[in-house]
């Protein structure tokens, strides 16, 4: 009888300790999951990848050059390039759409972006000339850490390709 009583009391003490220890492990695991949800985008490399896909051509309009060099208009111009890319090259034959979208993580939006005029692209040729000039002047881009959604497990039915979230 004494043996059963002491075994029960030991088990009653070990159970709460085991539960506390298990919760501590779960908390530290969650912290490491958060680390895995971050990755670094090398913004300069993304800009160079866009640059090599565009033909070498000169941009002559000095107003366009000034607009495209203006650091306060970077995000507005990027948004305009994304719209123009969709309009002029909806099949993404230049294969730059995803890279332009990644650049959105590298170039922060300004509070006054909605009222600023962006670059105007007349056609695909004009778009490529201006985009090339724009990307050449993104020399000071720094790597940024971005979050990404958790990767689906092999049992997931709704697999989606990884998207970058800024």
UniProtKB/Swiss-Prot annotation:
Compartments reported by the entry: Secreted
GO MF, one example: growth factor activity
Entry keyword set: Cytokine, Disulfide bond, Glycoprotein, Growth factor, Secreted, Signal
Disulfide bonds: 43-106, 105-166
First-listed, main subcellular location of the protein, grouped into a coarse class: secreted
Region (Disordered): 145-166
Example of a GO cellular component annotation carried by this entry: extracellular space
Tissue: Activated T-cells, mast cells, natural killer cells.
Signal sequence residues: 1-27
Annotated glycosylation sites: 60, 70
InterPro entries in the cross-refs: 4_helix_cytokine-like_core, IL-3
An example Gene Ontology biological process: negative regulation of mast cell apoptotic process
Self-association state and partner proteins as the record states: Monomer.
Similarity field: Belongs to the IL-3 family.
PANTHER family listed in its UniProt record: INTERLEUKIN-3
Task of the protein: Cytokine secreted predominantly by activated T-lymphocytes as well as mast cells and osteoblastic cells that controls the production and differentiation of hematopoietic progenitor cells into lineage-restricted cells. Also stimulates mature basophils, eosinophils, and monocytes to become functionally activated. In addition, plays an important role in neural cell proliferation and survival. Participates as well in bone homeostasis and inhibits osteoclast differentiation by preventing NF-kappa-B nuclear translocation and activation.
Name of the molecule in the record: Interleukin-3
Lineage, top ranks: Eukaryota, Metazoa, Chordata, Craniata, Vertebrata
């Amino acid at each position: 009888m004494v043996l059963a009583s002491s075994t029960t009391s030991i088990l009653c003490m070990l159970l709460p300790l085991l539960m506390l220890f298990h919760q501590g492990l779960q908390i530290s695991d969650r912290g490491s999951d958060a680390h895995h949800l971050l990755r670094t985008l090398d913004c300069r490399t993304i800009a160079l990848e866009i640059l090599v896909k565009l033909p070498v051509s000169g941009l002559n309009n000095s107003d366009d050059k000034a607009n495209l060099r203006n650091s306060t208009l970077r995000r507005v111009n990027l948004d305009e390039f994304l719209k123009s890319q969709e309009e002029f090259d909806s099949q993404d034959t230049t294969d730059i759409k995803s890279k332009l979208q990644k650049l959105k993580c590298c170039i922060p939006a300004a509070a006054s972006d909605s009222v600023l005029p962006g670059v105007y692209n007349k056609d695909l040729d004009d778009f490529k000339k201006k985009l090339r000039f724009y990307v050449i002047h993104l020399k000071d881009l720094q790597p940024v850490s971005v979050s990404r959604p958790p990767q689906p497990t092999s049992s997931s039915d709704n697999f989606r390709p990884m998207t970058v979230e800024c």
